Amino acid sequence: MIGTQSILPPGFGPGSHGEEDRLDYLPMPREMHTFERPSLPEPEQLDSHPIALALLERLQEALTAYRIGEQSRVIGLDRQPKADLKLLQQILGEGEVAIQVGGQRPVRIQETVLAGVWWVQLQVGLGEVVGQWLEVADIPALVRRRAFAEARWPRLGATLPDDLLNAGPVLVELLEAAKQHAEHASATPHVINLSLLPFSAEDQRFLAEQLGEGPVTVLSRGYGNCRIASTATPGIWRVQYFNSTDRLILDTLEVTAIPQAACAAQEDIDDSAERLREIREALE
């Protein structure tokens, strides 16, 4: 049995943020996550916060115009009044996907209830927010830029440990696929399903040591949970699926730019544009 805390990195998830200008991450779900309109403020509350309404209008324009594969649409929030941002957070709520990007300038990203609309926060120190914006995209551009910015190819020894079952062949296959991907990126991921292989604890340890840990961790919440983590090897991701009781049910490695489980589709974007129209109408 794998518990909730074992699949979340330190400082990521419920209880990791204060209230002021921070994103609040929801507890791990126990059942199917479906769209629920967030608790909206009364229209009269917005009368004194026209900036929040203006930001929603800009977001509507961005959602309507954006197409998957294009440059993401960014709406800066740094100079906006805190009261308006608080209302905006209330209106947009929290969606299925949360992302942490490590490094000297950590980044926390929370998808809103509108799939493909991301609230991005740059942080320093103990979580002080030094920059934030809304981004309309399949996944924020910063995630793509930093996932493998400092990745390196592992150096294999002449011999492998004697106690391995399948880690050696799996690693060779992964590295060959990753090098092909680096030369000629393919939209189709190369997937190895470890759940179907005899794979010992020694295999897991050896593979983890060789691939290393990357800076990006994604938690996607739907029916159960999906944890996606970049490795320190170019193009290789660990993608793990857990059921509603946190039991690991599928353990895979993917060679791809970004696993599709982390991304919004064009259908999601179009649906979010319609939902935002409904929300704005309810606020009139």
UniProtKB/Swiss-Prot annotation:
Pfam families recorded = HupH_C
Q: Where is this region: Disordered?
A: 1-23
The UniProt entry, under InterPro entries, shows:
HupH_C_sf, HupH_Hydgase_express_prot_C
State the name under which the record lists this protein.
Answer: Hydrogenase expression/formation protein HupQ
What's the family? Answer: Belongs to the HupH/HyaF family.
